[in-house]
Amino acid sequence: MMRILSLLVFFALGGPAQQLDVVLSAIQGLELVGPQSPDFEALVTQIIGTDRPVALVAALPYTVVVRNRTSEAIAAIDTVWTAPDRILLNAADAMFDQAFLYVKPGQAVLASPPGILQNQRQLRIFAYGTADDHRLKNFQDPGNVTVTVDAVVFESGQFVGADRYGAFERWQAQIQAPRDLATAVLQRRGGQSISDIVSWLEGLAAVRRPPADPHAQETIPTARVLLAVYRSKGEEALYSRAKSILDVPVFPLRR
């Protein structure tokens, strides 16, 4: 779920943050609190404590507190940052297969460009050196930034929101694409050699520029995971991993 970023230098390039304008969400029961609010600092401390990695401190001017005041836990949040002339980041963060991370009724979390933060333990992600920094490249000197929550998915699977930025299709792909690839692997098992199957997976995994289609986007990381399993544990482990993907109950996403 977390968008892992190495941003110490990155944010330094951006200079001082501009004002973050928080647009209240049209989703009933969702409360947003931005850095301009006198309550913001206390809420941040309540959620993650006072020990703040440098990268998080730099991200806080673009961060918003999201409190769930509905009666149902939230399984996915689409937070969108925009500038007057462009979308800076459309972060459709989902916890479909991690029920322990659902945002419970009454709970508040931080929606920041690096990811959704729920507690202090998650801050260790900032110490890791891996990066998905394309998610924040447009935050370099962005001017005035607007943030809102465009859509959520509740624990029941119910999608709620305007869906102006394609979150439903992206979440649908996150659920279905791994299952489709796992099914294809098991179907090929009987009619193709393992070398042919691996070659096919390598072709899927080798894509460097993400395609526009969300289903194709979500196929790439699954192919890489399956390849890693095969390379470390062998053919039977590959098929076992594919089967385990299909054994997981399907999250009931619906409009």
What positions do the PLM features span?
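Intrinsically disordered, low-complexity Pro/Gly/Ser/Thr-rich segments with frequent PxxP/GP/PP motifs
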Residues: 85-139, 155
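Beta-strand-rich interaction surfaces with strong enrichment in secreted/lumenal proteins
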Residues: 51-52, 74, 98-102
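Asparagine-centered strand-capping/turn motif at beta-strand->loop junctions
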Residues: 58-60, 64-75, 83
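A eukaryote-biased signal for long
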Residues: 194-255
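Sec-dependent N-terminal signal peptides
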Residues: 2-14
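Short beta-strand elements
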Residues: 160-191
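Low-complexity, acidic Ser/Thr/Pro/Gly-rich terminal tails and inter-domain linkers that flank the onset
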Residues: 17-61, 69
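Short acidic/polar inter-strand loop motif in beta-rich domains
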Residues: 86, 151-162
